[in-house]
Amino acid sequence: WGPDYEKRYNMIYKKVKELYPQIKTIANEHVEKNGCPAECVDEHFYNTTEFFAEHVNYYDDYDRKGPKIFVGEVAVNEGNYMGQLYAALGEAAFLMGIEKNQDIVTLASYAPLFENVNYRAWYPNLIRFNNHQSLGIPTYYVWKMFGQNRGDYVVRSEDEGGRVYRPRTGMASLKSNKELRFRNPIWNGEEAKITHELMGHVQDTEDGLLLQLPDEEQKKEFHSILEWADETKSFVVFGEEDQTYGRFETDIFVEENAYFELGIFSARVVRSYYEEQLVITAGVEKEWDAALVRPFLWKVNGGQCSLEEFGYMHDNKLTEDFAISVKPGEYHRFGYETDGKQIRLYVDGELQKEISIPYGPAFVSVVTDTKDEIIIKAVNFAGDVDPVSITLDCQEQGDYTVTLLSGEKGDENSFEEPEKVKNITVNMHGASSEFVYEAPRYSVSVLRLKKCEAF
């Protein structure tokens, strides 16, 4: 990238267009931001089920004057449900957002596609095979259902439903870019102890506890995992992962221009299928390392604060910056409390900020139609049947079909049970301009409704 690249790009683009005007350019980066034209940009999404559920409206506000989008790679490859039904629900919801915005998202594909289970370099893959069998993961059936049920036009629609809050575990942590003095850490009224010194060490002093910076061995180990990351910050964790809901507080000595971070939900995450399988099949305990623990971070920079979450290559803000009143050279009591839905931040007993934990919709839908039919695609993320009240602006025939993918969150296909998760089609009755469809728990549904003939 840079001026030389952009100069050559424009020269090549201009000449190719002169000779082959029918060729469309798909760039793998938003080169148009630097004055380089492209008809389409290839965007990739690899993340957790929750990420896709929370970003179903990702393209709603996309600049329609910019290049079209090719979602070239999209898959759940982090978290607890890779290759399983719940991951397919998240991907299905994201695809519904794409379908609503197909004026700008003109192409989409799952990646990777095929996996020889004896020579695997990546997981999950859409279709798995060995020398004798093949199977599709649950996501395969989502793409099949969506591909077989496309309408001619997207219909304006609205849906309402509950929320699914992002599941979090773990207690507090502390991070700092220089030595940090603290004392009297308390969790739900009892002393909270440091359980994991991920970066740096904690030393007892006459004045309390001193969080020291990482030693050279810790820096080297961390740098080997995340080469691009800052290995100079200390990082220690209180308590265990099952200590999630409650109140944490501790006294922190605030120096002039102090910078430190108070972590919330300091638990290990599953970064890949291979880590998960080592835990499940080999009984290998997940390591406690600074790259694997991803709390929400209450960042304190002097008198300015924000709450952020870990993200590659930068942290994502959950709040705008806000000010707190602290006096340098003194201890101040910092704390938080959470019930799994809200986080409340305190300084010296005074509430500073109340934030909702990120959440996605429990119900997501998209509606398309043809001359003769209405097609409704819907995802129910909830663990209960959802009686969905459907209201249409046209009259429908009573008989309709539902293509359904459902089961338990962790259901997956294997060579022993290759079709444990597979779509089925059932005939139903009772459709009209207003009727109720009971969406099964953890399900993707495609309803095909026949319009009544106009007289």
Residue ranges and their predicted role:
Residues 310-335:
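Short, aromatic/His-centered strand-loop micro-motif at the edge of beta-sheets
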Residues 10-150, 383:
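Catalytic-core region of carbohydrate-active enzymes that cleave or remodel glycosidic bonds
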Residues 348-360:
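Short, solvent-exposed beta-strand-to-loop segments that form ligand-recognition rims
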Residues 215, 219-307:
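Secretory/extracellular carbohydrate-interaction modules
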Residues 420-455:
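C-terminal beta-strand-rich structural cap/linker in extracellular carbohydrate-active enzymes
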Residues 95, 101, 109, 123-194, ...:
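Catalytic cores of secreted or luminal carbohydrate-active enzymes
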